[in-house]
């Protein structure tokens, strides 16, 4: 959005809601395209999604609309390897001629901040690829050598077992969080991939002079619980919606991967041992939420 605004291009949010699992409604997309036929359009689709943790389940319908209105789609698949189902889902399966796939190593490798990635263009968009390559060469020439060497290993070696363990562990801790928060009336959708969950506190928090926005809520949780999350307003949601995004990544990845090196079933009783900070934080949050009602 900032880049588009810099070029004086209009940015339109196609709003989603919890009732439809935070998915883009194909009918809403079609309505917008129909009302703005004269403008060239780019659809940015992120799945598995940040901040919701959900995966889009109507890709074929979205692809049909994209084809009808000749959209260029940027399919942000940075979390694709962390889809808990282990199945690769992409809009490019249904609309390859107009879909640009973006990805990288920072998420599935657990290498936050190590920004090395790829963009895959179809032949039909070769001219656009050439233009972007030219702009990129004038913006950044390369990434640092350590990241390049890490990427060589990441892309040249099979990581099936590692990815399986990553998906399993994230699915387990996300289910624990979902069940705990839901038990006290905090509304959320069970994550399907990645490591985020979007939570609606509106039914457990009485809006007061100190909590009127999602930013107020996050500040209060940080001050009283040392619990950090981001306000929904950072992701385009209305300021007065008491919605926050949580990330469930504060654990010892090496220990968890070692635990999953054997095929013994992971039991819920093991969560405090392998995810102690998340376990303690969620338990404190649940207790705090009860006190606010």
Placement of each model-derived feature along the sequence:
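PLP-dependent enzyme catalytic core of the Aspartate aminotransferase-like
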Residues: 34, 210-211, 220-229, 235-293
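Helix C-cap/helix->beta junction micro-motif
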Residues: 7, 36, 68-69, 184, ...
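Active-site phosphate-binding strand-loop segment of PLP-dependent enzymes
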Residues: 16-86
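Conserved glycine-rich beta-strand-loop-beta hairpin in the small C-terminal domain of fold type I
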Residues: 168-178, 188-204, 240-242
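Substrate-binding/gating loop at the entrance of the active-site cleft, primarily
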Residues: 1-11, 18
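Conserved core segment of the aminotransferase class I/II
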Residues: 97-171, 175-181, 265-268, 282-283
């Amino acid at each position: 959005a900032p880049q588009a605004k810099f070029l004086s291009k209009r940015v339109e949010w196609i709003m989603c809601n919890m009732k439809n699992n935070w998915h883009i409604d194909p009918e809403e997309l079609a309505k917008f395209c129909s009302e703005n036929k004269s403008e060239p359009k780019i659809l940015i689709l992120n799945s598995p999604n940040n901040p919701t943790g959900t995966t889009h389940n109507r890709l074929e319908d979205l692809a049909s609309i994209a084809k009808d209105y000749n959209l260029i789609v940027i399919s942000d698949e940075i979390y694709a390897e962390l889809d808990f189902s282990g199945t690769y889902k992409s809009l490019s399966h249904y609309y390859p001629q107009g879909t640009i796939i973006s990805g990288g190593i920072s998420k599935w490798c657990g290498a936050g901040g190590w920004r090395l990635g790829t963009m895959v263009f179809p032949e039909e968009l070769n001219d656009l690829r050439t233009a972007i390559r030219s702009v990129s060469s004038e913006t950044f020439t390369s990434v640092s050598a350590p990241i390049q060497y890490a990427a060589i290993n990441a892309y040249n070696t099979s990581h099936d077992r590692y990815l399986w363990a990553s998906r399993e562990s994230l699915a387990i801790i996300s289910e624990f969080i979902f069940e705990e928060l839901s038990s006290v009336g905090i509304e959320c959708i069970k994550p399907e991939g990645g490591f985020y969950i979007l939570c609606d506190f509106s039914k457990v928090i009485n809006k007061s002079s100190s909590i009127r926005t999602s930013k107020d809520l996050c500040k209060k949780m940080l001050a009283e619980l040392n619990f950090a999350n981001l306000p929904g307003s950072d992701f385009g949601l209305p300021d007065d919606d008491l919605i926050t995004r949580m990330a469930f990544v504060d654990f010892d990845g090496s220990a968890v991967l070692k635990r999953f090196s054997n095929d013994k079933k992971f039991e819920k009783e093991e969560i405090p041992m392998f995810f102690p900070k998340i376990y303690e934080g969620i338990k404190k949050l649940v207790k705090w939420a009860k006190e606010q009602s």
